[in-house]
From Swiss-Prot:
Belongs to the universal ribosomal protein uL14 family. Signal peptide: none annotated. This is Large ribosomal subunit protein uL14. SMART domains: Ribosomal_L14 (SM01374). One of its GO terms (molecular function) is large ribosomal subunit rRNA binding. InterPro entries: Ribosomal_uL14, Ribosomal_uL14_bac-type, Ribosomal_uL14_sf. Binds to 23S rRNA. Forms part of two intersubunit bridges in the 70S ribosome. Gene3D superfamilies: Ribosomal protein L14. Pfam families: Ribosomal_L14 (PF00238). It comes from Prochlorococcus marinus (strain MIT 9515). GO terms for cellular component: cytosolic large ribosomal subunit. The lineage of its organism: Bacteria, Bacillati, Cyanobacteriota, Cyanophyceae, Synechococcales. NCBIfam families: rplN_bact. The keyword Ribosomal protein applies.
Length: 121
């Protein structure tokens, strides 16, 4: 579960390395899960890339340490909390996605991120 002040690792090559969640988008929502969009601040970034430190960006959650339960009875959990930066059209800012992503992204119409990911769990 991602909430305000949560630190996230960035799972793409947009230039940012770490994010801090500012707000979970939605009507008065407190927690974000896989596939939810958050507003975040860039805390660490690579020089000469698309984003800079202290930029405010939108990101979609692709991995969480909180257990994700599926309708089939399975449950999965990842090793970190990770997000992918997106633009206003909900397309990823980077051209590559690192690490596995959850299958729930396909249900929430983030098919471009799913197609870029090396593994979908």
């Amino acid at each position: 579960m991602i909430q305000q002040e949560t630190y996230l690792t960035v799972a793409d090559n947009s230039g940012a390395k770490r994010l801090q969640c500012i707000r979970v988008l939605g009507s008065n929502r407190r927690y974000a899960h896989v596939g939810d969009v958050v507003v975040a601040s860039v805390k660490d970034a690579l020089p000469n890339m698309g984003v800079k430190k202290s930029d405010v960006v939108k990101a979609v959650i692709v991995r969480t340490r909180h257990t994700l339960r599926r309708n089939t009875g399975n449950s999965i959990r990842f090793d970190d909390n990770a997000a992918v930066l997106i633009n206003e059209d909900k397309n990823p800012k980077g051209t590559r996605v690192f690490g596995p992503v959850a299958r729930e992204l396909r249900d929430k119409n983030f098919t471009k991120i799913v197609s870029l990911a090396p593994e979908v769990i």
